[in-house]
C-alpha cells in the first residue's frame, strides 16, 4: 500500500462531514448529511460523479407492492441464503439491515427524480422521451412461466430492478439528481481533487483530510471534519500492485479487469479511478484491512450469456453442471486449459430458452419476431429474438 505522503496544506476549510468519492455511495452520503443540516464537502478526483450499470435488489416496500412482489419471499430466507453463499464470512446483521430497510432507501433515492418512469413489467413499452429521461423496471417480471425459484439449487429471488436510459452511464440520471439535491442543500463539491492523507487528533479520532487540487497547481487543501470523514472511494482493481497482493489470481490469470482498463471511470489526469485510495488512507492511519478479498469476476457468457447450455473445454470434455450462477461459472472456467470454455447449443435453442432459469446474465424469454422493435426498452440480457439469422448465434 506504500507509504503515507508527507504533505502540508496551504489552505484550510472547515466542514462537519467530508466525503471522499462521488460515486453512488458518496453521492447518497452527501445528500443524506446535507439534508440533515450538516456542512458537507464531497471530494472526487474525476471531473464529475462516477456511476454505471443500474441493477438493485430489495425486498418488500412500495415498489415491490406496486409490482405484486411484496412478501413474495421471506426476508430471513434470502438472508440465510446469502450467508451460505458467503460461507459465513460476512455479518448477518448487515444483511438483515439491508433486507429490512433497503426499500426505504430506494424510495428516498428515487424521490430526487420526479421525472422517473416506473414500468410495471420488464419490457413495458415506453417512448423514446421516457427512455432518454430514465426508467425503472422490475427484472424478470412477470416471472417466466416455467420458472420457480423455490425449486432451484441456486435460486434467483424475484427482487431485482434496474434503472435504464439512453445515457452511457445508464443510471447516471438518478445519481445526478441525488447529487443536485445534495448541492441544493449546501454540499460543496471538490471535483478534480485527490484524497492524499487522513488527519487524526491525539486520541486517534479522524479529524479531516488533506486533498490535492489537480486543477489548481496541485495545491494541497486541508478539509477539517468536525463530525467525521466518510471513505467512499470505490475499489482497488485498477492498481496492479495492490491486486497482486490481495487478489493475485486476477493478475496471474490475466482476468479481464474493468477497473484496470478504466471502464469504471477516469480521473482528471486520465487514469482509472479504482486505485484503492481509501484503502491506503485508512491503512496508513492504522485501520484494519478486511480479510478475504472477493473479486467480483462473474462470467457473463457469450451470445447466450450464462444460460445453462452445454459447456466444454479445449479438450472437448464437459467439466461442470452448467446450471449455476455467473461467479461459480467463472470459477470453473478458470480451472480449464487456457481458462477457455465453449458453449454449445443446437437449432432447438428457441424452444429451450423459455425453460431456462431467470438468473443474472441468462436468457429465459423469447421475443416474437413480429413484436414491435420501436420500444427503446427492448434490450435486456434475459431476452433473445427468434429470427431467420438464428444460426449465426450457434456454437459461440
Where are these regions (language model features)?
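Conserved N-terminal glycine-rich FAD pyrophosphate-binding loop of Rossmann-like flavoproteins
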Residues: 46-70
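Glycine-rich loop(s) and the adjacent beta-strand/alpha-helix scaffold that form part
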Residues: 216-219, 224-299
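N-terminal Rossmann-like FAD-binding beta1-loop-alpha1 element of flavoenzymes
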Residues: 17-41
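N-terminal leader/propeptide and maturation segments of large enzyme subunits in energy/redox metabolism
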Residues: 79-105, 110-122, 354-396
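Conserved redox-cofactor binding core of oxidoreductases
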Residues: 99-219, 240-241
Amino acid at each position: 500500500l506504500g507509504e503515507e505522503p508527507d504533505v502540508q496544506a496551504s489552505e484550510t476549510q472547515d466542514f462537519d462531514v467530508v466525503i471522499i468519492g462521488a460515486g453512488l455511495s458518496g453521492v447518497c452520503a452527501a445528500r443524506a448529511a446535507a439534508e440533515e443540516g450538516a456542512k458537507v464537502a464531497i471530494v472526487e478526483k474525476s471531473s464529475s460523479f462516477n456511476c454505471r450499470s443500474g441493477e438493485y435488489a430489495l425486498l418488500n416496500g412500495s415498489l415491490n407492492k406496486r409490482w405484486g412482489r411484496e412478501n413474495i419471499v421471506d426476508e430471513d430466507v434470502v438472508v440465510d441464503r446469502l450467508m451460505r453463499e458467503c460461507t459465513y464470512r460476512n455479518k448477518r446483521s448487515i444483511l438483515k439491515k439491508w433486507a429490512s430497510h433497503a426499500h426505504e432507501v430506494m424510495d428516498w433515492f428515487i424521490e430526487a427524480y420526479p421525472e422517473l418512469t416506473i414500468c410495471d413489467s420488464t419490457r413495458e413499452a415506453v417512448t423514446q422521451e421516457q427512455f432518454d429521461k430514465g426508467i425503472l423496471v422490475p427484472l424478470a417480471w412477470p416471472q417466466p412461466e416455467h420458472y420457480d425459484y423455490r425449486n432451484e439449487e441456486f435460486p434467483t429471488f424475484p427482487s431485482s430492478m434496474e434503472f435504464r436510459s439512453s445515457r452511457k452511464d445508464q443510471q447516471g440520471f438518478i445519481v445526478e439528481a441525488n447529487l443536485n439535491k445534495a448541492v441544493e442543500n449546501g454540499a460543496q463539491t471538490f471535483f478534480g481533487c485527490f484524497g492524499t492523507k487522513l488527519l487524526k487528533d491525539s486520541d486517534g479520532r479522524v479529524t479531516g483530510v488533506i486533498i490535492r487540487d489537480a486543477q489548481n497547481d496541485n495545491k494541497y487543501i486541508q478539509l477539517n471534519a468536525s463530525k467525521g470523514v466518510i471513505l467512499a472511494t470505490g475499489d482497488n482493481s485498477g492498481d496492479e500492485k495492490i491486486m497482486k497482493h490481495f487478489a493475485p489470481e486476477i493478475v496471474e490469470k490475466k482476468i479481464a479487469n474493468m477497473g484496470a482498463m478504466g471502464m469504471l471511470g477516469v480521473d482528471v489526469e486520465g487514469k482509472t479511478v479504482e486505485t484503492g485510495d481509501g484503502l491506503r488512507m485508512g491503512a496508513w492511519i492504522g485501520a484494519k484491512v478486511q480479510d478475504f478479498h472477493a473479486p467480483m469476476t462473474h462470467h457473463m457468457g457469450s451470445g447466450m450469456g450464462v444460460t445453462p447450455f452445454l459447456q466444454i473445454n479445449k479438450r472437448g470434455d464437459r467439466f461442470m453442471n452448467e446450471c449455476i450462477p455467473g461467479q461459480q461459472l467463472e470459477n470453473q472456467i478458470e480451472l480449464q486449459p487456457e481458462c477457455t470454455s465453449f458453449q454449445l447449443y443446437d437449432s432447438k435453442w428457441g424452444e429451450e430458452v423459455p425453460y431456462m432459469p431467470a438468473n443474472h446474465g441468462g436468457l429465459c424469454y423469447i421475443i416474437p419476431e413480429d413484436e414491435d422493435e420501436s420500444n427503446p426498452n427492448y434490450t435486456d440480457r434475459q431476452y433473445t429474438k427468434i429470427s431467420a439469422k438464428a444460426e449465426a448465434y450457434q456454437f459461440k
